[in-house]
Amino acid sequence: MTRRALISVSDKTGIEAFARALVERGWELLSTGGTLAALRAAGIPATAVSDVTGFPEILDGRVKTLHPAIHGGILARREEGHLAQLAEHGLDLIDLVCVNLYPFRETVARGATFEEAIENIDIGGPAMIRAAAKNHAGVLVLVDPADYGLAFQDEVSQTDRRRLAAKAFRHTSDYDAAISTYLAGADEAGETLPEHLTLDLSRIAAVRYGENPHQPGAIYRLGTERGPVLDARLLSGKPMSFNNYADADAAWALAQELAAQEDQPPGTRAVCVAVKHANPCGVAVADSVQAAWEQARDADTLSVFGGVVAVSRPVDLAAAQSMRGTFLEVLIAPDVTPEAVAWFAAKKPDLRVLVADTAAHPGTLDVRPLAGGFAVQRRDTRPWDDLCPEVVTVRPPTEQEWGDLRFAWAVVKHARSNAVVLAKNGVTVGLGAGAVSRIWAAERAVQNAGERARGAVLASEAFFPFDDVVRLAAEAGVTAVLQPGGAKRDPEVIAAANELGLSMVFTGSRHFRH
C-alpha cells in the first residue's frame, strides 16, 4: 500500500530535500497553498488537498484541510473497524503529517496590526497536528525540521512516536499561549494586568546548575521576546552560568538607563557598571570606557573582585588592558574590538566577553515566583524626566549636586532594598543595599565611602521614617539628599536638613526592589 504524507509548512527549512526523499521512497505527497506551490516549483510531484477533498479552498484560504477526507485519514486507527469505515466512504489513510504553523509570534513581534495578527492565527494546522499527535501510534507527526530524518527509519519506535507527539502538543500549546497572551493584552492600557496570563517559555540554554551546585538550572525565552543579555554573543571565555546571566542582565539594565540619562549627545560619555549578586558595587560616568571602568573599579575595589561589568560604549584594547589586574566573571558591551577580543582570549581566557543584542528590549512584565504561583507587575522603567522633583529645603541643590542626585537616583533604583547610594562627580563612592533598615543601609554606604563622602550627595529609593539618615549624612559631609518623601515625619526630616544646611529633594516616586 502506498504511504501518504501531508505536508503544509510555514517554515520551509529543509522541506524540498525532505519531500524529494519521501517521493524517492515511494511516498505520495499531499499539500496546500504555498507549500504545494514550492514543491511543484521544485519539480516534486504533490497532490493538492482540494483534489482529495473534492472541495476548493475557500474564505481566502481560511478553510483548506478541515474536511473528513483529511481528518478521517489522520485519525483512523489501524484496525479493522476504522479501516472498513474509511473504505466505505472512499477515504485513504494518511501516515505522516508534517506541519508547522503560521508565524503568529513573528507577525506580532514586528508590530503588525490587530487585523494582520488575526489573519495569522492558524486553524487547520493545529487541528491536523493535534489529530496526528493523538493517533501517533499510526501516524508520524513532524513539527520540527530537526526530526525529518526519523521518517526514513525502517521502523519508528513507539518511544520516538510518543516523543514526537509530546513535541507536537507542546508546539500547539505554545502557539495557543502566544495568541491568548496577545489577545489578552491587545486592549490593555498598561494600568492593569490581564485576568489570565500564560507564560510561554522555551529553553534556549543549558547551564551547569542554578544559583548553587545542588540546584538544576536552565535559561528560557519568554514567547518571542529578545533580551540584550539573553541574545548576546559570547566572543571569548567560558560558557555563561545561571548567576552570570542574572548579574549581566542587572548590570546592562543600569548601564543603559544611565547611558540614556548621562550620554547627551549620544557617544560623548561612557558608563561603566560593576555588579555583584545583582547589586551595583561601582558605577561611573566618564569620557572613555577606560576612565569609566577605572573609576567604577576604584569605587569599591574589594567588592568588584569576581564581579560582572557592563559598559555603554565599545571596548577597545586600552580599556581591555586596564582590566588586567582585576578578576571579573563577565564583561558585556555594545561591541568589542578584535584587538581587545584577542587580548582577552590570551590574557583572561576565562572571562566571558559578551556583545549585547542592542536591538533587543525587555518586555514590560516583571514575573516573580511564589509557592504555587507568581507575582506579576509592570517593570519599573520610570525615567527621571517623568518625575517632578520638589526642593523641600531652604537651600536648593547646586548644578553639580543636581547632576549627581540624578545619577545617584538611577543607581539606587537598581539596588536591592533598603538601599542608599552616595555619589560625587558621576561616580558612586558608597553603596548600602539589601539592608533590613534604612539607617543600616545608610551606615553601610557612609562606611564604604569614608572620606569620599565629603561633598557627595545621597539618594534613597524609599522615604526616611526618621531624621537619623539625614543627621548621619550631614556628619559624614554629604551636602544634598534625594528621597521620595511621603513619611509621617517628613516635617521633622526637612527641619533636620535645614538645621544642618543640607539641600533635600523629594521625587514623589518610590523604587523598592526585592
Swiss-Prot record:
The pathway this protein participates in, as annotated, is: Purine metabolism; IMP biosynthesis via de novo pathway; 5-formamido-1-(5-phospho-D-ribosyl)imidazole-4-carboxamide from 5-amino-1-(5-phospho-D-ribosyl)imidazole-4-carboxamide (10-formyl THF route): step 1/1; Purine metabolism; IMP biosynthesis via de novo pathway; IMP from 5-formamido-1-(5-phospho-D-ribosyl)imidazole-4-carboxamide: step 1/1
Extract the SMART domains matched here: AICARFT_IMPCHas, MGS
Q: Does the keyword Hydrolase apply?
A: yes
Q: Which Gene3D superfamilies match?
A: 3.40.140.20, Methylglyoxal synthase-like domain (3.40.50.1380)
Q: Name one Pfam family in it.
A: AICARFT_IMPCHas
Which keywords does the record carry? Hydrolase, Multifunctional enzyme, Purine biosynthesis, Transferase
This protein's record includes keyword Hydrolase: yes
Question: What reaction does this enzyme carry out catalytically?
Answer: (6R)-10-formyltetrahydrofolate + 5-amino-1-(5-phospho-beta-D-ribosyl)imidazole-4-carboxamide = 5-formamido-1-(5-phospho-D-ribosyl)imidazole-4-carboxamide + (6S)-5,6,7,8-tetrahydrofolate; IMP + H2O = 5-formamido-1-(5-phospho-D-ribosyl)imidazole-4-carboxamide
Q: Which GO terms describe its molecular function?
A: IMP cyclohydrolase activity; phosphoribosylaminoimidazolecarboxamide formyltransferase activity
Enzyme Commission designation: 2.1.2.3, 3.5.4.10
MGS-like domain location is 1-143
Q: Name one GO cellular component term.
A: cytosol
Q: What InterPro entries is this protein classified in?
A: AICAR_Tfase_dup_dom_sf (IPR024051), Cytidine_deaminase-like (IPR016193), MGS-like_dom (IPR011607), MGS-like_dom_sf (IPR036914), PurH-like (IPR002695)
For biological process, the GO terms are: 'de novo' IMP biosynthetic process
Similarity field: Belongs to the PurH family.
| Record-linked PANTHER family | BIFUNCTIONAL PURINE BIOSYNTHESIS PROTEIN ATIC (PTHR11692:SF0), BIFUNCTIONAL PURINE BIOSYNTHESIS PROTEIN PURH (PTHR11692)
Q: Write out the domain note.
A: The IMP cyclohydrolase activity resides in the N-terminal region.
Q: What is this protein called?
A: Bifunctional purine biosynthesis protein PurH
The gene is purH
